[in-house]
Amino acid sequence: MNVKLDEGMAFGLGVFETIRIERGKAILLQEHISRMRCGIRQLGIEREEVNRRLAPERICDWIKERSMKQGALKIIVTEKNILFAE
């Protein structure tokens, strides 16, 4: 994982969501994405890459590529980072 030092990593200026995964599906995915996008707008850290990476189909692909059946996916967005972690 390549993490860039920015105000989000140093001071917590960013948004995150922890999404439950059951039977390979993200639970309440659209609600999580909507909440993240709202926070991203409020912090003024919107950019096209964030919109692409937070597309529901991209998130579902990430889950499938890792064969996640159960667990949690954490998504962190800061000014310079978009991180996905199990």
What are the language-model segments listed below?
Residues 1-86:
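Conserved alpha/beta cores of soluble small-molecule-handling proteins
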